[in-house]
């Protein structure tokens, strides 16, 4: 056996014996590093005759190539083995039932649950979610929504105003989520189908009102949108949201500056017990307001009302949560009472889906 064969056999044994990546790296350095055994052999080529260099050099280079390949293969094998061992050690059997803790920790707030339920319903209808700032300009909160300066309808909102800026203009805490309609029309070309959940602010506080409350509204803009489409959307929403097979609704004429015609929508229900039951009974419950988007609002959004039309609707999230889940006092939503949350809250893993059930 020649010197090269002996060295090759020795290195192959060391490579095979390397049990981890640091060990195989040590073998590489001892063989192919600057002072490695194979590198030292390559240094001897300079003192050889051309004839010796031709035969000896080819053999040494072949040894270097073989050892390099073997080290690479061993390194990859060790890396794969390390990954497999780590995966095995960190594997969680997801088929096992979750162990109940002595006390359940954390609950989803009913408002968060309601937002997830409503957005899941409208997402299935092809709507996207739109959001906007809580602090708005007078223009987006009032003027662009057909509340001109001095319009008596502005008195309907007890608004939180900020101090005037250097130009004398005052911003407001938005009194409704409708400013997002204008911002969306300015930035997006029709067709538009959006649902807008968010916080709103008015100076009011009692068992059914709060200075900060939540709204959700929807907007559809297209060339052929009409009241029939609006009615279908709202009926499908109510059936799915209240988890009933059918609903009876009535549309009463009303007034909103940003829609024409405008309607208040009532849904038939049974109010004889402590919890309102929808889809049955002979009572009526008002749940939302809606209407066809006013031409002035379309113009403010940069759209031609002779070409486009649309419809919109809006409702209070807090109130509709109270109706669906039988919560008597709106102020409890914001008291941070752990006992109330344990009673009315939802488990974190119970995400609402149309297939699994909205309020499981």
UniProtKB/Swiss-Prot annotation:
UniProt keyword annotations, A-Z: Aminoacyl-tRNA synthetase, ATP-binding, Cytoplasm, Ligase, Magnesium, Metal-binding, Nucleotide-binding, Protein biosynthesis
InterPro entries reported for this sequence: aa-tRNA-synth_II, aa-tRNA-synth_II/BPL/LPL, Phe-tRNA-synth_IIc_asu, Phe-tRNA_ligase_II_N, Phe_tRNA_ligase_alpha1_bac, Phenylalanyl-tRNA_Synthase, tRNA-bd_arm
Protein source organism: Agrobacterium fabrum (strain C58 / ATCC 33970)
Name under which the protein is recorded: Phenylalanine--tRNA ligase alpha subunit
Membrane is among the record's keywords: no
Residues bound to Mg(2+): 260
Gene3D superfamilies: Bira Bifunctional Protein, Domain 2
GO BP terms: phenylalanyl-tRNA aminoacylation
Originating gene: pheS
Subcellular location: Cytoplasm
Cofactor note: Binds 2 magnesium ions per tetramer.
Its EC number(s): 6.1.1.20
GO-annotated molecular function: ATP binding; magnesium ion binding; phenylalanine-tRNA ligase activity; tRNA binding
Pfam family for this entry, one: Phe_tRNA-synt_N
GO cellular component: cytoplasm
Catalytic activity from the UniProt record: tRNA(Phe) + L-phenylalanine + ATP = L-phenylalanyl-tRNA(Phe) + AMP + diphosphate + H(+)
Family in the record: Belongs to the class-II aminoacyl-tRNA synthetase family. Phe-tRNA synthetase alpha subunit type 1 subfamily.
């Amino acid at each position: 056996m020649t010197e090269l064969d002996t060295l090759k056999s020795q290195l192959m044994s060391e490579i095979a014996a390397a049990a981890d990546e640091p060990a195989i790296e040590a073998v590489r350095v001892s063989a192919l590093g600057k002072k490695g055994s194979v590198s030292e052999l390559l240094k001897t080529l300079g003192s050889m005759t051309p004839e010796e260099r031709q035969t000896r050099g080819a053999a040494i280079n072949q040894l270097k190539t073989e050892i390099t390949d073997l080290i690479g293969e061993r390194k990859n094998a060790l890396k794969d083995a390390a990954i497999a061992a780590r995966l095995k050690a960190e594997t969680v059997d997801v088929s096992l039932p979750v162990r109940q803790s002595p006390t359940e920790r954390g609950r989803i707030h009913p408002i968060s649950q309601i937002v997830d339920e409503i957005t899941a319903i409208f997402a299935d209808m092809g709507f996207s979610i739109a959001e906007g700032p809580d602090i708005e300009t007078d223009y987006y909160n009032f003027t662009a929504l057909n509340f001109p300066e001095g319009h008596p309808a502005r008195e309907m909102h007890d608004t939180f105003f900020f101090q005037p800026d250097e130009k004398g203009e005052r911003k407001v805490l938005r009194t409704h989520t409708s400013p997002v309609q204008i911002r969306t029309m300015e930035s997006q070309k029709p067709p538009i189908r959006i649902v807008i959940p968010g916080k709103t602010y008015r100076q009011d506080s009692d068992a059914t009102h709060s200075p900060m409350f939540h709204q959700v509204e929807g907007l559809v803009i297209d060339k052929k949108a009409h009241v029939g489409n609006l009615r279908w959307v709202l009926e499908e929403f109510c059936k799915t949201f209240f988890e009933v097979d059918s609903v009876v609704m009535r549309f009463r004429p009303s007034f909103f500056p940003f829609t024409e015609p405008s309607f208040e929508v009532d849904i038939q229900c049974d109010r004889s017990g402590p919890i309102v039951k929808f889809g049955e009974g002979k009572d009526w419950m008002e749940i939302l307001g809606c209407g066809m988007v006013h031409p002035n609002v379309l113009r403010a959004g940069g759209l031609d009302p002779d070409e486009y039309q649309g419809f919109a609707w809006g409702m209070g999230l807090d109130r509709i949560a109270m109706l669906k889940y039988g919560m008597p006092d709106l102020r409890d939503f914001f008291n941070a009472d752990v006992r109330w949350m344990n009673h009315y809250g939802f488990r974190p893993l119970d995400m609402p889906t149309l297939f699994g059930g909205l309020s499981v």
